[in-house]
Amino acid sequence: MQIQLPMFQNSRVVVVGDVMLDRYWYGATSRISPEAPVPVVKVEQLEDRPGGAANVALNIAALGSAAVILGVTGKDEAAQSLAARMESAGILADFQEHETLPTITKLRVISRHQQLIRMDFEESFAGVPQEQLEKKVAGQLAGAGALVLSDYGKGALRDPQAFIQLARSKQIPVLVDPKGSDFEKYRGATLITPNLSEFEAVVGHCTSEAELVQRGLKLVEELELEALLVTRSEQGMTLLRAGRSELHLPAQAKEVFDVTGAGDTVISVLAAALAAGSEMGQAVALANIAAGIVVGKLGTASVSAPELRRAVQQEQGAGRGAMTVEQLKVALDDARAHGEKIVFTNGCFDIIHAGHVGYLDQARKLGDRLVVAINSDASVSRLKGPARPINPLERRMAVLAGLEAVDWVTWYEDDTPERLLEILKPDILVKGGDYSKEQVVGWEIVEGYGGEVRALDFLDNCSTTAIVEKIRKDQVK
């Protein structure tokens, strides 16, 4: 399947469900408590992150889509923290505050990248009337491309049918991340996304692939769904639609570090992609790739559009690496259409050393994409002398293209990159070393079209020239 990334920035998604605050305490562990056989953690860092339905909204916003989050919280410090994080992420949050019940908070204590304990602070919101939340949702559906019901069984979605019927009456697709064994309450939804254990809790244990497909299709028919997506951990995910062949996608994760919030990522990417106009199979393929990214991160995390885009290109074996200027121009136009910021740097890069790697990592963090333009062999000889380059152009490009921080590598025949800057027009021009802006070649060009010029430090005591001289001296000895 050829996967296409949609224009996420053109979509708007409304999320309603059980919002939570994920709280992390990080610290060092070096001894066992004298009071009980448990480790003592010296807490060094505190962090709050949106969780539950709020994490779904955060994932949607990270992709570039407009996100709205609605749910029930307490009237407490945790609710204030959650609202502040929604605002800082550019998410419109409209919470129904309860006077006496607490905001659902999950506190995790982590040391040496391991979760030692989780403590939950919560009371069910099942007794809270839903009418106020329904009115809030109705007021936010105008212009929405999808509605997500993020059900964690905490009571905010006591009656999902009210939200499903409201959205479907406006021809807005409804995606449900379900909870519990009663899927009847999700009847009429566009898509539900149970994991395997949730699915089998409803249909019974499946002893074969054929049985899973058969029972899944029966569920699609009985609940009047358009589709059912069963997420199956290391076995990938399976999409089932009436009258269509099943679509099975293998798991993408190279290394599983933390599965916290992976289900949120799946439904977030699905909703944002469908809202942006993707076909269902395409949206599922994107969600599968995103899940593979997020389980490699620690804690409740999100996936950005550039991350997803790079992963798609790696999956399809295209879109990165060494390119001609003409090919690169097309790639940059496409990246800009997806709202990505382009960083550009240049140099000879004759012998790649630790200073180069650290510098390129810094440069990459300034934007979404990094272009490295290198001098041709003839250009290097003019600048460095007839004994250079040590490595020919093809080898220098191959090494740079293999670095994780580098998206694209190209070359130029001139002694300066000025003509290349006029063609590519990067957002940020970066140079390594202790330079003033006026000493960076091409700064007038970049600032002339509204770009930015930055100078970054190299790692101390790292120099290609010094390395070459040392090799020559060692040979003389």
Curated annotation (Swiss-Prot):
One of its GO terms (molecular function) is phosphotransferase activity, alcohol group as acceptor. It comes from Hahella chejuensis (strain KCTC 2396). The keyword Cytoplasm does not apply. InterPro entries: Bifunc_HldE, Carboh/pur_kinase_PfkB_CS, Cyt_trans-like, PfkB_dom, RfaE_dom_I, RfaE_dom_II, Ribokinase-like, Rossmann-like_a/b/a_fold. This is Bifunctional protein HldE. Homodimer. One of its GO terms (cellular component) is cytosol. Keywords: ATP-binding, Carbohydrate metabolism, Kinase, Multifunctional enzyme, Nucleotide-binding, Nucleotidyltransferase, Transferase. Residues 1-318 are annotated as: Ribokinase.
